[in-house]
Amino acid sequence: KYDFDTYTSDITANFEAMEGREVRIAGRMMSRRDMGKANFIDVADGKGRIQCYVRVDDVGEDCFNAFKKWDIGDIIGLSGKVFSTRRGEISIHADSLELLAKSLLPLPEKYHGLKDTDTRYRQRYLDLIVNPEVKDTFIQRSQILREIRAYLDGKGYIEVDTPILVPLEIGASARPFV
């Protein structure tokens, strides 16, 4: 178990109050830019995404060497101070890193994304990781359904699930979709 204390969206929304403060976040490593003894990585949690600066002098050589073997898609935890880069991007200067879960399959390339419609529908989990607009659509759908259910529940209605496709005939000669 990794005890994080901040979501990435809290850092970006309240940067003035958070600047210089030590934070602990956990999320999926979405990209890495290697610059020798320093790396910039993007970490996405359930509420947003933030850039993190990882330097060998700050995390230690053993930790940094282990970090270099991690893959895009791995779930990591890190702690560090919030700062702004020279270009003005809100970031975390990491002082410790921890691998929380290994990604068994690689994520699609960042710039090409996941474009194949068949793959997007068959591997919905991947679509939700790679395409934030798809995730936003699912979140909105969930909120709408929650409000409709709350309204109807308040009026005394009950919810009944009715199956849409049910095999009524079972066996070798059954032809339910004719």
What name fits each language-model region?
Residues 1-178:
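Class II aminoacyl-tRNA synthetase catalytic cores and aaRS-like
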